[in-house]
Amino acid sequence: FGYVGSSPTAPTLMNTYTRFDISFKKGKGCWLWDRRGKKYLDAVAGIATCSLGHSDRILRNKLLTQLKKVQHISNLYKIEEQEELSKYLTRQSCAESVFFCNSGAEANESAIKLIKKYGNTKHAGKDSLILAAESSFHGRTIATLSATGQPKYQKGFEPMVKGFKFFKYNDIASVKKLFDECQKNGQKVSGVLIEPIQGEGGCLLYTSDAADDGL
């Protein structure tokens, strides 16, 4: 990058990350420019949250148009644009309905709550489990952290939320073994959390063979 070492943050900003001493001032598409005018190819994309690129003309105009009308009214009221987007998304996917969230962690947290709700209802409150993959990453809330198959991220935040067991990614035999163990112990599997592509785990792809085998 041409920069050495980390950048100290302002004392008023909570220190959570070691940051590069780079401050970006503008972006266009997949490109960024720092305060010195140096150009960078942005392969990080806000940790995969800016997939449309920076300063996208269509997105920018849509946001400005909406901000001039209504900024936020919550789910207490009918939101026509939200309903239209949900219809579009269900047409393009296998989903029958959608639940809009602000982040991946919130989406996974909601998924975990839905699985737990289903498990407690279906299994009459009996011990039910959620299976997740080793080397996975599902977020930094306490529940998603508990579902993350990497102890290094859980260190210092114990105890984790109970009810998770982990299998080897792309290993259907490992999954079947967990199911057998749960059945033997009188436990029920209420759901499975899995990433089609593991990012934190090393950009690992979930193979079609594993999917065809039943997961």
Task: Give each language-model segment a name.
Residues 9-97, 208:
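N-terminal glycine-rich, Lys/His-bearing helix-loop that initiates the first secondary-structure elements
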